[in-house]
Amino acid sequence: MPSVSRAVCVQRASGNNGRRCRDGAAAAGRRSVVAQRARHGKPEVAIRSGSGGSARGGHCSPLRAVAAPIPTTKKRVFHFGKGKSEGNKAMKDLLGGKGANLAEMASIGLSVPPGFTVSTEACQQYQAAGKTLPAGLWEEIVEGLQWVEEYMAARLGDPARPLLLSVRSGAAVSMPGMMDTVLNLGLNDEVAAGLAAKSGDRFAYDSYRRFLDMFGNVVMDIPHALFEEKLEAMKAVKGLHNDTDLTATDLKELVAQYKDVYVEAKGEPFPSDPKKQLQLAVLAVFNSWDSPRAIKYRSINKITGLKGTAVNVQTMVFGNMGNTSGTGVLFTRNPSTGEKKLYGEFLVNAQGEDVVAGIRTPEDLDAMRDHMPEPYEELVENCKILESHYKEMMDIEFTVQENRLWMLQCRTGKRTGKGAVKIAVDMVNEGLVERRTALKMVEPGHLDQLLHPQFENPSGYKDKVIATGLPASPGAAVGQIVFTAEDAEAWHAQGKDVILVRTETSPEDVGGMHAAVGILTARGGMTSHAAVVARGWGKCCVSGCSSVRVNDASKIVVIEDKALHEGEWLSLNGSTGEVIIGKQPLCPPALSGDLETFMSWVDEVRKLKVMANADTPEDATTARQNGAEGIGLCRTEHMFFASDERIKAVRQMIMASSLELRQKALDRLLPYQRSDFEGIFRAMDGLPVTIRLLDPPLHEFLPEGHVEDMVRELCSETGAAQDDVLARVEKLSEVNPMLGFRGCRLGISYPELTEMQARAIFEAAITMTNQGIQVFPEIMVPLVGTPQELGHQVDVIRQIANKVFTDMGKTIGYKVGTMIEIPRAALVADEIAEQAEFFSFGTNDLTQMTFGYSRDDVGKFLPIYLSQGILQHDPFEVLDQRGVGELVKLATERGRKARPNLKVGICGEHGGEPLSVAFFAKAGLDYVSCSPFRVPIARLAAAQVLL
């Protein structure tokens, strides 16, 4: 049994490389805390923060109390322990997810080490006060500390009765690895000596050197590599391979060397006063909120509206006190597959960061059952309690100290798309949740993952498998090797697919991880930083591949006996852990029966229809398979590029010097267009198909290259004289083509162009109708800015319709409408609705023209705008609700005043973006239209807005 001084330090956590931190929290378990204390002595305290930000930049300036804004909530420090807490799981906004769940676990009687949480509002006040602690906060923190000291009968800084703390962050939204944990806070020379007298030299000085490393890196911003160099040098001198082989004498020497690092790196000694350590750690947590990696993580995941991070200060328990101690991470169900079975990893005689950072290779959770049967049984029971209580799949961190189980953290577990759908369906079938609740358990992005490709023939590449690691995040990825996050982002910006190869990842790598199609790491388990982040994003990831040796400096990775350089192709199977040399072919994934069940529940709830943007029969078929209720945008110009003959006919039409020559070229195009429309009508039998007339500027159909080459090619294709072709090309040249001769302006200038397209549509529709296909054509006129423009095109279309109906002896129903993509059209929507039977918002161009941003040039300044908070989102990805959204609402209202039965939808890129879909549903639109593969995402988003 440990003596009182053996700190009950729950060391669960992210260490130096931005790893996910794990720590202990405060609450007595089903066994009373009093009994625990009697048996196991007094735990030490652990401090954690509750945010998702990086923990850089605490620095050494002392805390200064200054006047601060009046807090929204007067109480800013909330303690937990003794089987009851001052907070609960509903207080995530105030306590952060970590703090709220620690309080909840303590309240329901689980074994949680005691501690306190500093609220997110305190962080908000700190930021508002120019990064100065608000008045009175430090005194409140000291009171919280005294409460813990009194309960534990131990004191921070007391060598005889040492209390050690862990400090971590925890915002309302989980952001793995964004803030590193500080463990063993409170150690100095005197406390370490006192701890050694009661718990042994090796344990005390191993804890001390770990604390010096973590505190220096996380709080003082000293590079972890400086400490790592000292450690590796000592092991080399001693001829040792593992950290655990170092003796107590070695560790004492290492402590002295680590303290020298502080002087060398910062010009000042390590702060030995434990309360000063606590002050600086709290500052580091608060400062982590707006660190570059925290900002990037929130930007990537579109996380906005949070107050800040909480700080969790908690009594520590130790998993590194011998073979009856250990630490682990688990999910109550398999996060990759959704299988109802505990899934996790465990390490005997280890601290939490050893699991998540890949410092040691962990064992499967089943190994714990053999090593520690009693704590394992209690853990299994706790998992059942938590899953039943939260009605969710949970991510749990725990430590066993000398056969005593401590629950350190629980939160809703991140999962893959496949796992999310299965868990939701299974929990409904188990009677644990209602269907509507299950719909909220799956994110739209999860469905995106399910639609990612898999390998075409897994058995065909077996001879090319060069290594096998852990299957950390499922799916398949094929890309070119890069070794840094910066290179991954740069190559991705050039349109290249890349595989990010690292020894291990850290939160600094999140930008590159997001840019990569797949991630391969040499170290780290199934719950490492790389694995957790990759699963959350649906990225293929193979981790813990021990045969991988990365040389970042030379940009070479050696796998077994093969040396691969930057830019070489590599394939990853995240479902099996296989690393395959070369570029393996991919195919679309097969969708599960669980997804079909889940999507049927989605469709029972949603009211907004979901259509698809599809230009070919193949696209239309895919869209229908994914649940599209019609085609909301069929772009006719894409059909012109389908063959050389077609594009030559288009160019002849463009180069035509007379109506006769132009009509001749259009007559050649007519059968091509008619055939394409027949295929699409056939694929969408019984569903509406909205066909947009020609929209792009004519110059887009001309050959690329130098003018001389272009003229030579056009002369060859059209037989026209060189001077005539050159004059025509110069006439087509425009200063700003996106605002130039395009859309309905083409159809008005060349009515025969609209006539040809309308004839192709109506002839195809009647032909299909005669074959028993139900056809509902809708013709959409693009780039309308005045009712007169639309009126002109409507007249042309209806005249052709009547001619075709007469010639073919059959009449069919059809609609004529317009795209609303010019701000003026939105403002005069009531007048336009007199001619239009439907509106479809082209939000791509509407965004361009409303902001005055060119999509082709926005990349020059948009990253700056996003990083400085001038814009919260890329407006071409997420609809600008305040500006563009207001035009959408205004046009819808005015249009329906003039035509009450006006059908209104949207066909821009925003049609598949969840936040935008939710807005369109609330705005009263009838449908959204998006790419075929985003149809399930839009369906779910349309349902979730009603929950």
Curated annotation (Swiss-Prot):
Chain intervals for the UniProt region annotation (Disordered): 39-60
Q: Transit peptide positions?
A: 1-71
Q: Where is substrate annotated to bind?
A: R635, R692, E821, G842, T843, N844, D845
* Activity modulation comment: Activated by light-induced dephosphorylation. Inhibited by dark-induced phosphorylation. Both reactions are catalyzed by PDRP1.
Q: Which Pfam family is one of those matched by this entry?
A: PEP-utilizers_C
Q: Which reaction does it catalyse?
A: pyruvate + phosphate + ATP = phosphoenolpyruvate + AMP + diphosphate + H(+)
Q: In its keyword annotation, does this UniProt entry include Cell membrane?
A: no
Q: Which cofactor does it need?
A: Mg(2+)
Tell me how the protein is altered or processed after translation: Phosphorylation of Thr-527 in the dark inactivates the enzyme. Dephosphorylation upon light stimulation reactivates the enzyme. Phosphorylation increases during the first 20 days post-pollination and then remains constant through the 40-day mature seed stage. Reactivation by dephosphorylation during germination is negligible.
Q: Does the keyword Transmembrane apply?
A: no
Active-site residues, Swiss-Prot/TrEMBL: H529, C907
GO molecular function: any one?
Answer: pyruvate, phosphate dikinase activity
Which positions in this protein are listed as binding Mg(2+)?
E821, D845
| Tissue expression remark | Isoform 1 is only expressed in green leaves. Isoform 2 is found in roots, stems, rachis branches, leaf sheaths, green leaves and spikelets. The non-phosphorylated PPDK in mature seeds is endosperm-localized.
State its role.
Formation of phosphoenolpyruvate. The cytoplasmic isoform supports the biosynthetic processes in the nascent endosperm and provides an efficient mechanism for glycolytic ATP synthesis in oxygen depleted tissues. May be involved in regulating the flux of carbon into starch and fatty acids of seeds and in the remobilization of nitrogen reserves in senescing leaves.
Assigned protein family: Belongs to the PEP-utilizing enzyme family.
Q: What else is known?
A: The reaction takes place in three steps, mediated by a phosphocarrier histidine residue located on the surface of the central domain. The two first partial reactions are catalyzed at an active site located on the N-terminal domain, and the third partial reaction is catalyzed at an active site located on the C-terminal domain. For catalytic turnover, the central domain swivels from the concave surface of the N-terminal domain to that of the C-terminal domain. A second gene codes only for the short cytoplasmic isoform of PPDK.
Entry note about domains: The N-terminal domain contains the ATP/Pi binding site, the central domain the pyrophosphate/phosphate carrier histidine, and the C-terminal domain the pyruvate binding site.
User: How does the annotation summarize its subunit structure?
Assistant: Homotetramer.
Protein name in the entry? Pyruvate, phosphate dikinase 1, chloroplastic
